[in-house]
From Swiss-Prot:
The RNAP catalytic core consists of 2 alpha, 1 beta, 1 beta' and 1 omega subunit. When a sigma factor is associated with the core the holoenzyme is formed, which can initiate transcription. The keyword Transcription applies. GO terms for molecular function: DNA binding; DNA-directed RNA polymerase activity; magnesium ion binding; zinc ion binding. Transmembrane segments: none annotated. SUPFAM superfamilies: beta and beta-prime subunits of DNA dependent RNA-polymerase. It comes from Salmonella typhimurium (strain LT2 / SGSC1412 / ATCC 700720). This is DNA-directed RNA polymerase subunit beta'. One of its GO terms (biological process) is DNA-templated transcription.
């Protein structure tokens, strides 16, 4: 018996491995895998259902059909195992060997492997340096190829047609060798000397100068080197032996009625074997060449179809006209092996059911239907029954459970106690989509869910279903309880704010409870405490809203963390006093002494978590929920049609708007405004009217007049149910109320343009047919949009997860001093995001100094928690340099300090945390809330774009940065720099507002001056760009010849004349090379120099410039010499929402990107071509100038002779991220992508922490291009992993050698995922064939570093609790001892888990 057990154990041994290598299989290797040759195309005998001998299902080759029984039945039972039956030749063993034993087919003629032929770029083509078309013509027997030219004038690899071949044969006889078909290609590949070829190419590479040639050579060298290094032989790309898949992986199943269901592969194999056998026969018969050739071609096509059907020519179809599924189709796509079976599996011990509300549950509980629990916990119940001796055998236990005896239910209760289960709701968009709960047995068939976790699951109770999973092992239960329990997931990993926040009814209940009311019953009472408040409320002596005085005891923590009590009399209401009873000790009373809306409640829970920690917060959240439900029920808030009060003013507002519209219409008919202007104006009028109506309506709703104690009238906040729901944040918004009681307003057509007739009615009045019809547009578009959005958002999430999946925190501190400078986000006059929100939970990269002093406020490497942030705010620090993932120096991972706080736990992040996946989920999860539309700017928006002044909102002082200016004749500052910024600083030194100031703006206030709110500080003409002189003197025209370079125009209305410079296209030949300019000279006619330089003041004028001054006029600095009319931007579309986020992460180049200066220097314009200008930048140090051709229609921001810095904008437009990286560096591109992505999310009110976007940016910057190789093994122009270059350079520098220089590359997320080092991860993402082909040729090793690869091969992932296990394995391997037990034991797991958890939970108190 012992032997038997030993034998069974040996059957299930697991392989320990550290890497997976993929390479080409040599014919010998294929034969060594094989257990025999498949000679016949037969499958099974249709009468006996026994496999045919030597056929595709042959038992002799692949193993027995029944366990331990040979085919003819001579040997049965286990005692004969290992015997080979002499009659039928079948080995007696388990039948599962039919899943792993392979066969082979000896091909009568070699055939090319289609992957290496047709997967672009063609590997065979690249290796032989022949065009794919030619190779295909040889392979499919259309032409000959010369293999050995001998002494003739024929080149090797020359292609000959049939006629040319015959001619050559006549001329040279057998001096030369030419063949056709795969044999020819095989011979060519065989005769290649790879190393010799490599040498030749390298020499050629050094000599050539042409860029395209270099690229091609580098590609070939790389491929050749890959072959040399991996030990693959090129001729192995041509198959001479074809492996046959084990039969149980391509099953043949008899259906009833004598038919068979079969895998398509069997058809494809049969076809190959048939053609191969026929070819053998033809060769034996020495058949005519043309017949043999045809058969060989058909064999090649059959093998192509088997490997990858449809890659070449038409796909081979089966009986039902659908293409057969080939081997390649089995692994790729959503239904392929990778995504269907390796990354996603069906799980045992799981069930699903509809969910319903469990308002009486605790936060860590869920209601599990008894029937379901009985089914899920069956094995545990059987075990317990047997242990207790209630059942003698498992079979008896089974019977008891099936009969559902009384004792079974008692046992079930025991089994379930403290055994957490996992609840999951699809779609699982972030990690909170699976959480653990303790089950509570309930009657009925629906799972009960705690209302507060609905937000995390995005669940509602309109028929949603959820799945239950049972963690079986001790370790799994431990992890579920310690890491996944709903009580441990109070904060959202995306932004660190509480995600367990009351909503809807609970909010309404708490809001109703904490409202106050004038002259309510019991007003003015003085009560001894919350208990008495509750008593008098229950007794009906006071209303919930009565304003009373109550004695309140507050607790505060002192230095030692002990609670100190303060008691005082507070003005409050009865309801607030009652609510105070559930607030935990340690929170101030002020937190509930207000009307609590959703925001306030969220803040309350957040404060509670930060001050008191996890446990009190959980209890408090539960209590708020119970209280909220109870008082929402008592409030009796309901909606009736009379609650929707329509404002009286509505009628007159609408008639006013109609009158205005009529007036515009008249103007249009008399030709004063264009159709576009009329449309925009009409829309503006209606939009304004709509706002007025809704304002009137809200004013009407939000207050009501009541009689107070003294009998006077008083205004108070309304108790209108609809208003209360919106005001508390429970449900609905002002916009929705507007549609109920105001007017519905403007509607959009399906294409996004606005219909100019608004719906003036609201839902209370009811819509007429036309209005109803217009509204249906919007409603339907909404539904269609939602469906599209979900798919797009899901795809974005998948790409993000794929690019970031292998990023894990691997060390504590990388020691870098690099970081990102964080400043508050200010748009126009508003602080969109204060500094504290941006730096909270980050680690400082440098000491933060107290502004204006050298005192250190916060030392370097400090994790900024709430108290530090308060300190920063108190000292009004407005910029902090923090560590960032992007600048982290860790190889293949990130250090904890560069990441900072784990947002979901509130302490510094643990090692082994999978930050990449968390980042991807945090960005992808809100994707469905983003819009899909592109915004058409028109109407109000287009006019706002043509701003002409800056008006500040707050009082403070002005601070200008990046400024060059001159003072004009009236003493005002005129800006002459391009990217000037104006900031408004308040008295505490904090930046309140920030504006861009254009060139030529006239400042009303200077730098450092005080301004009051509402003051205008700068003016400019939005329609023209001025040319401003920096010096005073007299104007001298140069090259301004009337009729050749300029023309004089007179304005009809004013009679003033001006000169207009002609565009070079409009000039006569004589004027083509002239450069019109205005020179400034002094009274003697000498050139005036620009201050600070030795350059004469000379201003070149571009085409279309208007000069209103005459030659010789005196001017003073700051005057406008000429004006260049600006084309008004027209209506540009802004891509918004999801498509914009996808564009940013895919690093797509915008259509007409901004043109940036490649080097610093002086701008001048060279010779123009037909449609382009030549921009020349000459460096100041006299090195080579840089030239670039720019299309004429691009508006330039620079004048001739102006100095630019590297990365300055020369022509406006959306900036391309690649340019920013190249010219301004990694931090600039990070800042750009983070800010742009945040803008999109901020617009939708979604909060995501910056560091998640930075994590993705780090992954986009994974690759670097080698510029010069130094002493390294890299090739110039090769793209390599950034970490690899860093490691190589470190080693070289340690040995005193020259490292490689490189430039960082920015890859879009799809590209970056495919360029990952792990071929398994890339193959399971997209383009499986290409990835695998490339990997096989290079003989790649996959080190299984990322999470995805480990999931695919079925190991623990190297993150979370698996991180410790992997670290331990690496340590053991380094010590050179193999572990005695490959499996991880329960003790190890629980120990390492405990260590991890202590790190996690211990860190929360002291930050």
């Amino acid at each position: 018996m012992k032997d038997l057990l030993k034998f069974l154990k040996a059957q299930t041994k697991t392989e320990e491995f550290d890497a997976i290598k993929i390479a080409l299989a040599s014919p010998d290797m294929i034969r060594s895998w094989s257990f025999g040759e498949v000679k016949k195309p037969e499958t099974i005998n249709y009468r006996t259902f026994k496999p045919e001998r030597d056929g595709l299902f042959c038992a002799r080759i692949f193993g027995p059909v029944k366990d331990y029984e040979c085919l003819c039945g001579k040997y049965k039972r286990l005692k004969h195992r290992g015997v080979i039956c002499e009659k039928c030749g079948v080995e007696v063993t388990q039948t599962k060997v039919r899943r792993e034993r392979m066969g082979h087919i000896e091909l009568a003629s070699p055939t090319a492997h289609i992957w290496f032929l047709k997967s672009l770029p063609s590997r065979i083509g690249l290796l032989l340096d022949m065009p794919l078309r030619d190779i295909e013509r040889v392979l499919y027997f259309e032409s000959y190829v010369v293999i050995e030219g001998g002494m003739t004038n024929l080149e090797r690899q020359q292609i000959l047609t049939e006629e040319q071949y015959l001619d050559a044969l006549e001329e040279f006889g057998d001096e030369f060798d030419a063949k056709m078909g795969a044999e020819a290609i095989q011979a060519l590949l065989k005769s290649m000397d790879l190393e010799q070829e490599c040498e030749t190419l390298r020499e050629e590479l050094n000599e050539t100068n042409s860029e395209t040639k270099r690229k091609k050579l580098t590609k070939r060298i790389k491929l050749l080197e890959a072959f040399v290094q991996s030990g693959n032989k090129p001729e192995w790309m041509i198959l001479t032996v074809l492996p046959v898949l084990p039969p149980d992986l391509r099953p043949l199943v008899p259906l009833d009625g004598g038919r068979f269901a079969t895998s398509d592969l069997n058809d494809l194999y049969r076809r190959v074997i048939n053609r191969n056998n026929r070819l053998k026969r033809l060769l034996d018969l020495a058949a005519p060449d043309i017949i043999v050739r045809n058969e060989k071609r058909m064999l090649q096509e059959a093998v192509d179809a088997l490997l990858d059907n449809g890659r070449r020519g038409r796909a081979i179809t089966g009986s039902n006209k659908r293409p057969l599924k080939s081997l390649a189709d089995m692994i790729k796509g959503k239904q392929g092996r990778f995504r269907q079976n390796l990354l996603g599996k069906r799980v045992d011990y799981s069930g699903r059911s509809v969910i319903t509300v469990g308002p009486y549950l605790r936060l860590h509980q869920c209601g599990l239907p008894k029937k379901m629990a009985l089914e899920l916990f069956k094995p545990f119940i059987y075990g317990k029954l047997e242990l207790r001796g209630l059942a003698t055998t498992i079979k008896a236990a089974k019977k008891m459970v099936e009969r559902e005896e009384a004792v079974v239910w008692d046992i079930l209760d025991e089994v379930i106690r403290e055994h957490p289960v996992l609840l999951n709701r699809a779609p699982t968009l972030h990690r909170l989509g699976i959480q653990a709960f303790e089950p509570v047995l309930i009657e009925g068939k629906a799972i009960q869910l705690h209302p507060l976790v609905c937000a995390a699951y995005n669940a509602d109770f309109d028929g949603d279903q959820m799945a239950v999973h049972v963690p079986l092992t001790l370790e799994a239960q431990l992890e579920a309880r310690a890491l996944m329990m709903s009580t441990n997931n109070i904060l959202s990993p995306a932004n660190g704010e509480p995600i367990i926040v009351p909503s809807q009814d609970v909010v309404l209940g708490l809001y109703y409870m904490t409202r106050d009311c004038v002259n309510a019953k019991g007003e003015g009472m003085v009560l001894t405490g919350p208990k008495e408040a509750e008593r008098i409320y229950r007794a009906g002596l006071a209303s919930l809203h009565a304003r009373v005085k109550v004695r309140i005891t507050e607790y505060e923590k002192d230095e030692n963390g002990e609670f100190v009590a303060h008691t005082s009399l507070k003005d409050t209401t009865v309801g607030r006093a009652i609510l105070w009873m559930i607030v935990p000790k340690g929170l101030p009373f002020s937190i509930v002494n207000q009307a609590l809306g959703k925001k306030a409640i969220s803040k309350m829970l957040n404060t509670c978590y930060r001050i008191l920690g996890l446990k009190p917060t959980v209890i408090f959240a539960d209590q708020t929920m119970y209280t909220g439900f109870a008082y929402a029920a008592r409030s009796g808030a309901s909606v009736g049609i009379d609650d929707m009060v329509i404002p009286e003013k509505k009628h007159e507002i609408i008639s006013e708007a109609e009158a205005e519209v009529a007036e515009i219409q008249e103007q249009f008919q008399s030709g004063l405004v264009t159709a576009g202007e009329r449309y925009n104006k009409v829309i503006d009028i209606w939009a304004a009217a709509n706002d007025r109506v809704s304002k009137a309506m809200m004013d009407n709703l939000q207050t009501e007049t009541v009689i107070n104690r003294d009998g006077q009238e008083e205004q108070q906040v309304s108790f209108n149910s609809i208003y209360m729901m919106a005001d508390s944040g429970a449900r609905g918004s002002a916009a929705q109320i507007r549609q109920l009681a105001g007017m519905r307003g403007l509607m959009a057509k399906p294409d996004g343009s606005i219909i100019e007739t608004p719906i003036t009615a609201n839902f209370r009045e009811g819509l007429n047919v036309l209005q109803y019809f217009i509204s249906t547009h919007g409603a339907r578009k909404g539904l269609a949009d939602t469906a599209l959005k979900t798919a797009n958002s899901g795809y974005l999430t998948r790409r993000l997860v794929d690019v970031a999946q292998d990023l894990v925190v691997t060390e504590d501190d990388c020691g870098t001093h690099e970081g990102i400078l964080m400043t508050p986000v200010i748009e126009g006059g508003d602080v969109k995001e204060p500094l504290r929100d941006r730096v909270l939970g980050r680690v400082t990269a440098e000491d933060v100094l107290k502004p204006g002093t050298a005192d250190i406020l916060v030392p370097r490497n400090t994790l900024l928690h709430e108290q530090w942030c308060d300190l920063l705010e108190a000292n009004s620090v407005d910029a902090v340099k923090v560590r960032s993932v992007v600048s982290c120096d860790t190889d293949f991972g990130v250090c904890a300090h560069c990441y900072g706080r784990d947002l979901a736990r509130g302490h510094i992040i643990n090692k082994g945390e999978a930050i990449g996946v968390i980042a991807a989920q945090s960005i992808g999860e809100p994707g469905t809330q983003l819009t899909m539309r592109t915004f058409h700017i028109g109407g109000a928006a287009s006019r706002a774009a043509a701003e002409s002044s800056i008006q500040v909102k707050n009082k403070g002082s002005i601070k200008l940065s990046n400024v060059k200016s001159v003072v004009n004749s009236s003493g005002k500052l005129v800006i002459t720099s391009r990217n000037t910024e104006l900031k408004l600083i308040d008295e505490f030194g904090r930046t309140k507002e920030s504006y861009k100031v254009p060139y030529g703006a006239v400042m009303a206030k200077g730098d450092g001056e005080q301004v009051a709110g509402g003051e205008t500080v700068a003016n400019w003409d939005p329609h023209t760009m001025p040319v401003i002189t920096e010096v005073s003197g007299f104007i001298r025209f140069t090259d301004m010849i009337d009729g050749q370079t300029i023309t004089r125009q007179t304005d009809e209305l004013t009679g003033l004349s001006s000169l207009v410079v002609l565009d070079s296209a409009e000039r006569t030949t004589g004027g083509k090379d002239l450069r019109p300019a205005l020179k400034i000279v002094d009274a003697q006619g000498n050139d005036v120099l620009i201050p600070g330089t030795d350059m004469p003041a000379q201003y070149f004028l571009p085409g279309k410039a208007i000069v209103q001054l005459e030659d010789g006029v005196q001017i003073s600095s700051g005057d406008t010499l000429a004006r260049i009319p600006q084309e008004s931007g027209g209506t540009k579309d802004i891509t918004g929402g999801l498509p914009r986020v996808a564009d940013l992460f895919e690093a797509r180049r915008p259509k007409e990107p901004a043109i940036l200066a490649e080097i610093a220097g002086i701008v001048s314009f060279g010779k123009e071509t037909k449609g382009k200008r030549r921009l020349v930048i000459t460096p100041v140090d006299g090195s080579d100038p840089y030239e670039e051709m720019i299309p004429k229609w691009r508006q330039l921001n620079v004048f001739e002779g102006e100095r630019v810095e590297r990365g300055d904008v020369i022509s406006d437009g959306p900036e391309a991220p690649h340019d920013i990286l190249r010219l301004r560096g990694v931090h600039a591109v990070t800042r750009y992508i983070v800010n742009e992505v945040q803008d999109v999310y901020r617009l939708q009110g979604v909060k995501i922490n910056d560091k998640h976007i930075e994590v993705i940016v780090r992954q986009m910057l994974r690759k670097a291009t080698i510029e010069s190789a130094g002493s390294s093994d890299f090739l110039e122009g090769e793209q390599v992993e950034y970490s690899r270059v860093k490691i190589a350079n470190r080693e070289l520098e340690a040995n005193g050698k020259v490292g490689a220089t490189f430039s960082r590359d920015l890859l879009g997320i799809t590209k970056a995922s495919l360029a990952t080092e792990s071929f398994i991860s890339a193959a399971s993402f997209q383009e499986t064939t290409r990835v695998l082909t490339e990997a096989a040729v290079a003989g790649k090793r996959d080190e299984l570093r990322g999470l995805k690869e480990n999931v695919i091969v079925g190991r623990l992932i190297p993150a979370g609790t698996g991180y410790a296990y992997h670290q331990d394995r690496m340590r053991r391997r380094a010590a050179g001892e193999q572990p005695a037990t490959p499996q991880v034991t329960a003790e190890d797991a629980s120990a390492s888990l405990a260590e991890l958890l202590n790190a996690g939970l211990g860190g929360s108190d002291n930050e």
